[in-house]
Amino acid sequence: VKEYFRQQSDGQFTPEFEVVGPVTLSKSYKYYGEDGAVRKDVNIDYFYSEACKLAAQQLADWSDFDNNGDGVVDFVFFIYAGEGQNASDDDDTIWPKESVNSTSVQYDDKTITFAAFGCTNELFKGKQDGIGAMVHELSHALGLPDFYDTVGDAFGLDYLDIMDSGCYQINGYQPCCMSAYERDFMGWKKLVELAPDTACSL
């Protein structure tokens, strides 16, 4: 994941990670992954808050993850055991996602507030999952939207875009590159507007 972003940004962004865990939550995956009438994973907020409280007890200092100094942890990412709903026939599994939803947890007279979360699955169709879904969800945290049709069956760039189905190339082990638009959006590669008489070679 670190190398993916380093390459896509031409060395301008190299994320660093602190791995904490594993932790075991109090309920089964079906509780956290249960779908409602209009929303997937209606209890996902309980997943986040419980996992954050358990993780917070394993890491003494969270200040390194407060980039702007506002006293809030900017982002936490979870890899949960088993399959995700993106590749499972079980509707009660959790769908990989990024969520902006401030949550505070308390333990030992301490309060830690988290601004946003992301999560993805450990397994993909019975095998160890690659990095594609994690890269996709982290890209949401950086500001990129989905570029697949979230309400219908229209095709976009499909497997040619990391924010579409490109995160699933070779089961996530070889996610596609970011598009020129996405790199421009991130400020990593400025798009050049071509005039009608501009000569270009590919």
Regions found by a protein language model. Name each.
Residues 75, 81-202:
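Extracellular hydrolytic enzyme modules, especially secreted metalloproteases
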